[in-house]
C-alpha cells in the first residue's frame, strides 16, 4: 500500500504501524509520533519505504527497517531499538539519532 501527500504528513499511532513492502511519503515534512514518548512498533521491513522531501521525525519504541529504506533531507530518529540489517537510512543533511538500547546495522 501507499500513503503519500504533497504537504506535511503527521501521524500519531498508538501501537503498531506495518509498512512492509509499502510506501509512506511526503514532499514536505513527515512526522511519525513526533510528540512525546512513543510506544509505537514501526515495521518498515521487506522493501518498505519512508520518504520525506524535507525533514523526517520518527519517534518509536521499536523500529524494524530490515531490508527497508528511509530517504530524507534531514532525519530525527528516536527509538529504543533499531534493526537496520540489510536496510538503508539515507540523509542529505543532518541526521540526529537517539537509540536507547539496541542497534543492528549488519549489512545495512
Please place each PLM-identified region on the residue numbering.
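Extracellular beta-strand scaffolds
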Residues: 1-4, 9-11, 15-19, 23-25, ...
Amino acid at each position: 500500500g501507499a500513503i503519500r501527500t504533497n504537504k506535511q504528513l503527521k501521524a500519531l499511532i498508538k501501537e503498531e504501524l506495518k509498512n512492509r513492502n509499502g510506501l509512506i511519503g511526503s514532499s514536505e515534512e513527515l512526522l511519525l509520533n513526533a510528540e512525546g514518548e512513543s510506544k509505537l512498533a514501526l515495521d518498515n521491513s521487506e522493501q518498505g519505504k519512508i520518504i520525506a522531501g524535507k525533514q523526517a521525525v520518527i519517534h518509536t519504541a521499536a523500529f524494524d527497517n530490515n531490508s527497508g529504506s528511509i530517504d530524507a533531507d534531514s532525519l530525527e530518529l528516536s527509538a529504543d531499538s533499531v534493526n537496520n540489517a540489510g536496510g538503508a537510512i539515507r540523509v542529505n543533511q543532518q541526521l540526529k539519532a537517539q537509540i536507547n538500547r539496541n542497534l543492528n546495522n549488519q549489512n545495512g
